[in-house]
Each structure stands twice: as C-alpha cells, then as structure tokens.
Amino acid sequence: MIDVNNFEYMKIGLASPDKIRSWSYGEVKKPETINYRTLKPEKDGLFCERIFGPQKDWECHCGKYKRVRYKGVVCDRCGVEVTRAKVRRERMGHIELAAPVSHIWYFKGIPSRMGLVLDMSPRALEEVIYFASYVVTESGDTPLDKKQLLSEKEYRAYRDRYGSTFQAAMGAEAIKKLLQDIDLDKEVDFLKEELKTAQGQRRTRAIKRLEVLEAFRNSGNEPSWMILDVLPVIPPELRPMVQLDGGRFATSDLNDLYRRVINRNNRLKRLLDLGAPSIIVQNEKRMLQEAVDALIDNGRRGRPVTGPGNRPLKSLSHMLKGKQGRFRQNLLGKRVDYSGRSVIVVGPNLKMYQCGLPKEMALELFKPFVMKELVEKGLAHNIKSAKRKIERVQPEVWDVLESVIKEHPVLLNRAPTLHRLGIQAFEPTLVEGRAIRLHPLVCTAYNADFDGDQMAVHVPLSSEAQAEARLLMLAAQNILNPKDGKPVVTPSQDMVLGNYYLTLEREGAIGEGMVFKDANEALLAYQNGYVHLHTRVAVAASAVNNATFTEEQKSMLLLTTVGKLIFNEILPESFPYINEPTNSNLEKETPAKYFVEKGANIKEIIASREEVAPFSKKILGNIIAEVFKRFQITETSRMLDRMKNLGFKYSTKAGITVGVSDILVLGEKDEILHEAQAKVDNVIKQFRRGLITEEERYDRVISIWSNAKDVIQGKLMKSLNKRNPIFMMSDSGARGNASNFTQLAGMRGLMANPSGRIIELPIKSSFREGLTVLEYFISTHGARKGLADTALKTADSGYLTRRLVDVAQDVIVREDDCGTDRGLLIGAIKEGNEVIESLYDRLVGRFARKTVKHPETGEVLVAENQLITEDIAHIVENSGVETVNIRSAFTCNTRHGVCKKCYGRNLATGTDVEVGEAVGIIAAQSIGEPGTQLTMRTFHTGGVAGDDITQGLPRIQEIFEARNPKGQAVISEIDGVIAAINDVKDRQEVVVQGEVEARTYAIPYGARLKVTPGQPISHGKELTEGSIDPKELLKVTDITAVQEYLLREVQKVYRMQGVEIGDKHVEVMVRQMLRKVRVSDAGETDVLPGTLLDIHQFTDANAKVLLQGKQPATARPVLLGITKASLETDSFLSAASFQETTRVLTDAAIKGKRDELLGLKENVIIGKLVPAGTGMNRYRKVDLVKTTQDDMNVENDEVYVEQ
C-alpha cells in the first residue's frame, strides 16, 4: 500500500477498459454468491476466493494449505492464493460485457457530457442508447447526415433504397463509434473560430462544448471511455454478506445489482451465440444497459430498481452521497477507540484545568497504560496476567491507575460542538460514582448545564497528542473566546449572585463607620457579628496589600466595605483595589475620594455619601479581561478559581431566594391601562368614521399598548426595592431581566399569533394576578411558536455553519507578510445616528496600513505596519480621527490563505497569530456558533412594507448565499443629482441626472423613497429603503464597495442581537466569496471565455502572455454564495464531500483533475495530518527530544504553581 504521507497529490480520471482489466484479479462469470449448504463462496461467483482472496487468514478454499508457512502459495486444487483475508477489501474483479454500455453519469448528468462532446441533445442520445432510434454513423454517398436519427421505419426504407452504402446502428455501440470518430483538435479549433462571431444561445452552447472538449484534450482521457466494455466489480468486503441470528443472510444491495448485470450479460452472450433474431438481442441489450445504470446510479433514469418491501436499492453512487455516504460517514467522521461518554455533574471543588473521571471509566480508557505499568512495576509477569488483574479489578490496579492518569490530559467534548471550545483538555482526577465532574466555569464555553447533559471523553495517546492537548487545549488556556477576544469563562448564576451580594453597600448597616487596623481585624469583627458584609467601614490603607497605592495614600484610611475587602483579596497584588464598578478604577487606580485623613470624622463622611453600586456580571467580566491583559493565563485561571469559590460561598451565606411576596403588584397599573383603553376607543371611533385606514388603526392600537407596557415597566423597576431578591438576581446579571419582571408583576403585554402578526388584544394581567382563560389561550400561540422556531433554528444554524466551514476550510495563515500595498479604509459602522460598531472595536488588534496622524497636532499616533493595541486605539478614537487605513484579509495577496499582518491579532490568545493557524475554520465557527441565538423570523408589525426586511438568521443566510434580498432596494448606477421624482400610473419614477446622461428608475409598488429632488447621489447608493443586492452592487461599483457592504450588513444583524464578532472573521468569509473571476475575453491566453477562474490563476495566465508581448485576457469579478463557492473550489475531494457528489466527481474525472491537498478536508479524507498548526510542512521537520524528569518538574512548576 502507498504510505499516506508520501504522496503529493491525488488525481482522478476516466478508466480505460485495459485499466479496468489491469485492476482485476479475475472475471466474475456467475451470479452466485455463496453455497447454501457449505456457506463457502461459489467458484467464479461474486464472492469467489480465487478472484478475491481467501476468507480465512492463510487458508485456501479446499483446505489443502493452512498456516502462515505457505504464504504466497497458490493451491493447485482450488487455485486460491494463501494470504491474509484482508485482501478481500482491496482485490477487484471484472465482468466482460457482451455489448458496450453507456455510463449513466456522463450521459445523464446535467449538462450531459456525452451530448456536449457529440453535439447531440440528451433526448436524442437517450433514444439511441435505449434502442428507440437508429443513428447514422457513416453517411457514405447518401443524402443522410452523420448523427442523424432514424426511426425503425425510416431505417428500413433507406436500407432498401441505398443498400449498405451507409451505416446506422443503435445502442451504446453506435455512440461509441461516434465518440471514436471525433477529432478533438479539429473540433476545438472550429469552436474557437465560432466563438469569435457567435452570440446569445449559440455562444453559451459553444462555450460549454469547448470546456468539455478542452478537458478531454488536456487530460488524456478518451471520449470513448465514457462507454463501458468492461465493468469493474468492487471487493467483496465492501459489499459484505453476513449471516443473521436466524440463519438468514443480510446482504449489501450492490450484490443484487451485480447479480442482475451478470444474469443479463450471460443471457445476452447465449443469445448472441445462438444467433437470435435482432429484436430479441436488442431487448436484451437494453435490459443490460438498464441493469448497469441501476448499479452505477439507481433511480437516476426511470423508476429505481426495488428490493423487498419496495425499497429502492442503494447503488454505487448512493454509497458516496449524503450524510450516510462514504465521504461524510466514514472519511470525514470516524468513530474512535479510547473514548467513553457519561452524564455530567458539577464539580465545584475542581481547579480550572481538572475534571472528575469515574473510576471504572478511567480504568477502561487507560487499560493499555495500566497494563504496561503493572508489568514494569513487577506486579504482573506479562501483559496477559496484567489484563486478567484489571478484569478482576484487584486493589493494586487502582494505585497504578492513579499514577498513570497523573500528567495525562483527556479531552472532553459536548455535542453539538459549535466552536472549538466544544472540545477542551483537562487533567483527570478519579471520582467515585459513574458521572463525569465538570468545572462550573467551563460550562459557558460548552453551553452545558447539569440537567442530564452527557459528554464524551477521549484519550490522546501519542506523546505529541498529549503535548498539544496540554499546551493548546487545556481549559485553563482557553480563557478568551475566539469570536470576539472577550473572556468566555465569566462566572454565571450563583457565582455572580454571590459576588454581587458580597460587594453590596448598605446605608446604616450595623457598625457603620468603624475603623480597623487591617483586613483581618475587619473579618474578625464580621465573624463576631459587630459588622455586616455590607457595612461601610474604614481600614488603614497601609495594611491593605496593594502595590498601586501611593505613599501619601498609604498614610490615610481607605473607605470600603467588609465584603469588598474580602473580594479584593482574590486579585493579584499589583492590581488596583476595586472599590467601585468603573473602568477608571479597573484600569488605573482606586479613586482618591475613597481615601480620608486619619482622625477625620469617619461616620459623618460615610453618612454624607451615596451607596456605591455592587459588581454585576459585566464588571466581573471586565475584571477578568483586565487581569488577563496584565498577568496572562496562569494568574487569571487562579483568580477565576478564587472568584468561583467566593461566589458559591457567599451566595450560600446570602440565602437569597424567591417567594411570592417578593413580587409586588404595581398600584398605578389600573389607571395606566384605563388611559390606554380610552385612547384605543378613540382610535376605533376615528376608524369607524373613516378618518383612518385599517392599517393605521392597527398600528396605532399596537403602539398604544406597547407604550402602556413600557410605562408600567418603568414604574415597576423604579418601585422595586434594591434589596428585593428578584431585583438583585436581575441587576447582577445572574438570571432574569426587566421584561420577566414586567410579566410577573406588571402585565404580559402583546402576543403574536402563529403567523407572527401581533394580536391587538393585550394580556392585561400579570402572572402574579393570574391570567383569564382567554389570555391564557392567546399566550399559548406565542409559546408554541417559540418552541417550534427554536427547533428549526438549530438545524438551520447548524447547516449554515457547515457551509461556512466548507468554504473557508483552506484559509490558513501561510506567511508573515504578503507585502501588499493596499489596505481597507474603516470607520465606525452606523445605522442612522446609532453606532453599531465603534472605530475602537474595529481597530484593536489590527495592523495599520498607513501612518495615522493627529488631525490637529499632526503628531504620529500609529506608524505604518504597527499593531494597534487597546491603548493606541483609545488614543486614535479620542483624537477625532474618523477613518483609518488598516491591513485586512480583503486586500491580502497570500495564496490559499492570509498572512500574519493582514489578519492581525489572534483573538483567542490576545497575541500575534501564528503561521499555521486555521483562521478559516475559526472564522466559520465564530459566525456559525451564535447563529442559534439569532431570531428566526421578524415579527410582522402589521402589513407595513419596508418594516418587514429580513433580520436574524435568514438575513445572514441571504447575505452569505448572495441571494436577491427580500425587500430589495433600487440603487443608482451613476453619480449625479436627483433631477425629479414623477408619478406614473400607480408607481413612481426617479430620474438621476449625471454629467453625461440621465437614468430613470422605476420604483416598485410599496417601496419607500430615501431621496428627495435636488439631492446629490453617488453610484451604488440606494434610492429606496431596503437591502441592496450585492451582485447588482458589484456590477455598478468595485469589489471594495461590495466587501465593505457585506461586512457592514453581517455586523448589523449580529450587533442588533447583542452578539459581538470580530470583523476579521467576516472578512475571511467574504474574501472566499469573491475569489473567482469570470473570463469575458480570452485574449491570446489559454483560458476559455466564460469560465470561472481563481483570481491568482487568472493573473498568472495573463502574466505569462504579457511577457511574450501578446494580448492578455479580461475578466469580471464574480460574487458567489458560500454553497456555490464551496463547489467551485480547486479541490474536488473537498467539493465532492460537501454536496452534489456525483456532479463534482463526473466533472473532475473528465478534466482529469489533480487535488493538490492544500485544504484541511482533503487531507482528513485521505488520512494525512492536516496541513495546519504543527501539521504544516515547516513544522513537520522538527525532531522531538524526550525531556528528562528534571526538565518536566521545572516546566510544571511554571505552568501550575498551585498543584
């Protein structure tokens, strides 16, 4: 066999009859499979041992030769070679067909490749191949044309008139003769001439034909090989026959299909030998053709061949197609050994990098390691006795297991794995019971909860795999989320509540204004009940262990609370003492107002001050991000563990709980509802008098009730006590929000009906008061829709992720700097006056393309090619600079990937991106993972056009698939001024007056205008409200405008839903959609007009002819949707495993395509290491040196000081 790592590329082509015979180990002559009595394979049958190899290792059919010592002997009695049984997985056979048969892929595919080569219509081909018409193969000196179709009647008439001066035939033989007669060079030259003059349909047909003929000419495939003389038979182990319990046999459908072919083939041979009448022979040939069609692709033509119970049989094509096909089931998604799964429970006492592994599971997973260790320690004599010891679970096994799993990380995975944080590595600790223990902080990344979720465990075996798991995948390393660079391990729920409660302040609490010499004294006072956690006290600043205090501050007293003293102990020493939830306190130092002179009247000062807000979830997240920025991973993960412990401890101590009495019904509610009802009655009156339309009435009613609900919500939030448990839960960010309270204590408000239209009867009751029957019924609509939508959304979002991954999977950081001189001009993204994404957010972690200067002073803020850090970005934004020219993936020149400079910082680590990082996959995951959080459809607020523009997930799909948007905007094709807006019949027309010409645009019915007469407009800008069709925009403007538009639109959808995604991820995806051009004129190059080419291939072809001083080709950029872009990729393996498998393979075979194995999928499919990360060639040459125990100890001390 070929070694996986030794081949450079993979090529696919058409097989010639001789090639098929050379693969074969013998001809299959009989349709029999196995003998029903002996259960041994029949000779010359579909499972014949002589052809395919022995069924048992080292044993021939008749049993004359048994044992390894006869290796390679061919038995003289039964003719079976003595060898391993696994050759039955690779040895092929063949069937010599009595008549040529056409291959359905090439005859039936769209477009029909055979039809294009012969310049015949698929209808005509079908008539010939299935013996309905004759085709003239040689016209001789008759008035007939070559390739002319004749019916049976006409054929007889011409035969009688002209005798044998012409030749006509039917069936695949006739087609084969025509294919052999074709002179490719002559045809190609003829077509190239025709292209110079042809227009319209003739031109497109010529381009298609030229493409196929060129493919045959360049690939060395013969057109006549599309007709089969010999049929290959795949190895028997790939179409197995197994005995079931009841003695019956289950067999692969392929055996049935092969059997039909062999039966018909043998019958045809016999008929030909007997010299049967031609009509019988023709019928048999047609049946053979149909049998071969069914074998190759059952159901492609006519009704599929069915098995028992009318189930269509699965043919060779079905074996490759779809989720259950060879590609996606076995090559891209393999099942692995050394894995297990179990329910997860919370492990609050674990460290960040640990997980609890059930003992029996660990023993099974680490069995080989334990066996080896038992033998090495002398506790067992050999592997066999070690295995027995483990199976009997003897006590010494547990000690060995302990030592084996130490330092051996395991991977935990939770399905669905939406982004790379769905698989992380942990150090296992053995636990009793049968459940896996999971650290509470990693739940967010896994999106896990403990209501019965299950997780899978995998063991990395090789030392390289263990090293990668430890250094790259350890949970303590994955603190930032790759999609936005924010911490993903923020505390949630109980932990948030505990820290919130701990940092509360309360006016007039017990012991207010006491002064302590240090934190310990304050704690002592708290434990003895002299002060409360929330009491505002003073502590000598010198005793608080904090390096950010100045000398002057150290001589003063620090005003704080007991809880904040406890909270600040978890932070590193050189971090500011956090006394208030503000950014300045976090980033710079504790504000000066919290320091007072010793001897001042503390009680008075405290009493005169407002309470400081406690720390909510958002603030905790900011603290984590800031600690990470300053102290890197180890310190952060330690601080996180401490924060978790504090949270759990104090949420327990707080005893915060919810009771019915916490929900207080608003007193003024009735009054507000009365007012609203009166307004509604008024609107209805106006409607009845005909003053307003039905639509206006509906809209006004809806807005009146919405406003009433908002008023109630505002009053309710004001009336809630700051100590109300429910308020605390919501305010801290632990659970719940304002709208939940309004429903509990105010009113439920308006509901939508199943179609998404809002019902104008509001639900006036709250849950506290209870709903009436009608109200309950109305609210069930919305609830049911919510559940149904969620289910649909998950599937949609998963499919979107799959397409995104597919289109970007070969984008890898390939080099340090591509040396481009282009950049992307960026500013804040705005929608009206609202800033959707600020300039700061867009700048952080990017490289400047041009020097940025201060607009007033002219001082250099950022040099060319300098990384823009958070601090620099703040300075730039505050200086009043509107736009900055940065390096971007859009303008990167690197082939098959991006360079470090154009990509910028790796969001997951906060450092420069490494060469070899698979940024395409990361981008796809970052865009796909939040997909489930996006809403499904818009709520229709009545039938107002313009409001119904698609939002949420459907809009994202619309953008990435480059579909025509719903509610499409009309755009201007020229720069100019709006000259006039005219009313024509029932619609409007906008006239744009340019410098040279005027253009008139018809505005579709119901669209809203965005422009007024006399207003200047530039090309590519909208005249009406709505979404622009990016394809239109590309025609009118250039690539840059389209890239920016797509980026802006994607960001709009996500930011509106409160999801942050780094620009660079969207840039990587959009770049993949715009990497092709369509050749409009070939010039003197080798490229064909009308073909899609990669931009790089196109520039290469042009560079070649320009050097010879010839005419270059011209092309237009093309925007492809992600599905189309995936199928147009250079790698046929990647495309075939994505969608439309048969079409992709048909095409690739004719072109004789080479797959250079550049992307990730192609390499996974053939079983190579992926060419990203450490699998890249530049890293593969590294030698691994085993470190000694001393080195290991030093390293471990660095990684975990706390072990």
UniProtKB/Swiss-Prot annotation:
GO terms for biological process: DNA-templated transcription. Transmembrane segments: none annotated. Mg(2+) binds at D449, D451, D453. It is an enzyme of class 2 (transferase). GO terms for cellular component: DNA-directed RNA polymerase complex. It comes from the Bacteria. The keyword Nucleotide-binding does not apply. CDD domains: RNAP_beta'_C, RNAP_beta'_N. Signal peptide: none annotated. Zn(2+) 2 binds at C818, C892, C899, C902. Its EC number is 2.7.7.6. Binds 1 Mg(2+) ion per subunit. Binds 2 Zn(2+) ions per subunit. Keywords: DNA-directed RNA polymerase, Magnesium, Metal-binding, Nucleotidyltransferase, Transcription, Transferase, Zinc. One of its GO terms (molecular function) is DNA-directed RNA polymerase activity. Its cofactor is Mg(2+); Zn(2+). It catalyses: RNA(n) + a ribonucleoside 5'-triphosphate = RNA(n+1) + diphosphate. Belongs to the RNA polymerase beta' chain family. HAMAP family: RNApol_bact_RpoC. The RNAP catalytic core consists of 2 alpha, 1 beta, 1 beta' and 1 omega subunit. When a sigma factor is associated with the core the holoenzyme is formed, which can initiate transcription. This is DNA-directed RNA polymerase subunit beta'. It comes from Bacillus cereus (strain ATCC 14579 / DSM 31 / CCUG 7414 / JCM 2152 / NBRC 15305 / NCIMB 9373 / NCTC 2599 / NRRL B-3711).
